[in-house]
Amino acid sequence: MEIWQAIVLGAVQGFAEFLPVSSSGHLLLLQRLLGVTEGGLFFDIMLHIGTLIPVFIVFFGDILGLFKKPFKKMVWLIVATIPAGLTGVLLGDVIDKQFYSGTTLSAVLLSTTFLLTATELFVSERIQKQKNTALPLSLKSATAMGLAQSVAIVPGLSRSGTVISAGCISGVNREENASFAFLMSIPIILGAALVSGLDVIKGGVEIETLPIIFGVLTAAVTGYIAIKVMLKVIKKANYKWFSLYLILMAIVSISTKLIWEI
């Protein structure tokens, strides 16, 4: 992988991780377009780690709050993490095999999940604007957000979009919905990084150090910008432009694959 490719992928990861457009789906599509094949999944995980840096910066106070009595939010975060953790362990390899295979089926699957995210955002916007409730976060809503996150391990389904939508439907107030959704990314990304790191130790993945460094730094900077933008978007509950963009990406995913096979 060239350094410029790593920077491009890092920028895409940083923006797409926190905007509701699916970072894994974008990385998968872009890696295919750039011809990046070696260590693609491991590089993807490392870029996700890069996006954790701005989460710690922006939500430092919220993270400290997890360790204060009565530890209610910490318990909710653990509960919200369990579904995605189990899904990743049980189905992670199957999902990766289907989506990272480079086949026409993988392109169709990615297009489908992009469209599902577009639909989800459209429905979420309608619900959020119609509901007048602004409930505090609860165990019930945290569980709903956790179940939503377990579905969003599939490339093309936006983790942030899916989780925030679940919070919206549960009636959680926008500020708590946003902060908890971003906090939920921490254990999931760290867990995925641990699994990927074990694969590297076993010698299954070739590491390209310099591209990874540039990619991670780029992801951190663009991720910070994306978080600030997304916090404003959530306050206005205006997701329609993201829905339209995802429809376009669904078309790009399937059309580029079909064109290459002609």
Placement of each model-derived feature along the sequence:
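Multi-pass membrane proteins that catalyze or facilitate reactions on polyprenyl-/lipid-phosphate substrates
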Residues: 1-262
